[in-house]
């Protein structure tokens, strides 16, 4: 289930810095939009736009690859775990550069971390095939013209419900409601997902999961490849 985690929100807000106007691209239901900033949201899904809470930032129907704004319209552009959904990643990044006059902030994920995830390694190996070809952090930085990268370890009790949020709470993945908030489960073949969940349930009941991953239960947070990327726009 997806909801804003205040610790992650604080990291994103700090990365935005002293800007005033922000465009949130692939904004979804509006999580992580700083309430103290003048935010405009772009979201292509009518379903997600309808889920935005009352009083949320105004939202425009649009795609990252064709942002309906003039050049340099905002102090900053941001995207939170949405860039991997874009049809044309490099074009979307170019559009962020076009409309942002000062800063670009992405909360994203490094595909090279796949091997660090017990969920993908042991149960969802097919996820690797869903990663767009050429989607790497290096390519992202090149397309943005550089930037700094900040690791974002995920706390064991993360409020948000993205793919790796439950790394220390494996039974959560057995809940269909939890899985419904994670896009990967909808993209994978349903038989593959069912088999993975059956195996996970069996491994949890037998103690096999804890035998393989018990050291994780002692950790407060874990680096699973989530990153904040900050690019200062040079004009």
Could you tell me what each predicted segment is?
Residues 90-104:
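A short glycine-rich, Lys/Arg-flanked "PGG" loop and its adjoining helix->strand segment in the class I
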Residues 19, 74-75, 101:
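Local beta-strand N-terminus motif with an aromatic residue
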């Amino acid at each position: 289930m997806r909801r804003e985690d205040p610790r992650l929100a604080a990291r994103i807000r700090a990365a935005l810095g002293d800007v005033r106007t922000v465009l949130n691209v692939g904004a979804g239901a509006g999580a992580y939009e700083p309430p103290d900033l003048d935010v405009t949201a772009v979201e292509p899904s009518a379903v997600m736009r309808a889920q935005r809470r009352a009083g949320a930032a105004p939202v425009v129907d649009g795609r990252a690859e064709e942002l309906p704004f003039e050049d340099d319209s905002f102090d900053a552009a941001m995207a939170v775990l949405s860039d991997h959904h874009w049809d044309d990643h490099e074009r979307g990044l170019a559009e962020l550069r076009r409309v942002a006059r000062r800063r670009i902030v992405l909360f994203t994920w490094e595909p090279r971390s796949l091997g660090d995830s017990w969920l993908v390694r042991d149960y969802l190996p097919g996820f690797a095939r869903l990663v767009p070809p050429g989607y790497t952090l290096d390519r992202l930085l090149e397309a943005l013209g550089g930037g700094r990268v900040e690791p974002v370890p995920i706390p064991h009790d993360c409020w948000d419900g993205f793919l790796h949020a439950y790394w220390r709470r494996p039974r959560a993945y057995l809940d269909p409601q939890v899985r419904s908030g994670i896009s990967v489960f909808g993209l994978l073949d349903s038989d593959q997902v069912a088999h993975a969940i059956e195996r996970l349930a069996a491994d949890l009941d037998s103690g096999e999961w804890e035998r393989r991953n018990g050291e994780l239960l002692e950790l407060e947070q874990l680096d699973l490849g989530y990153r904040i990327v900050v690019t200062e726009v040079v004009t």
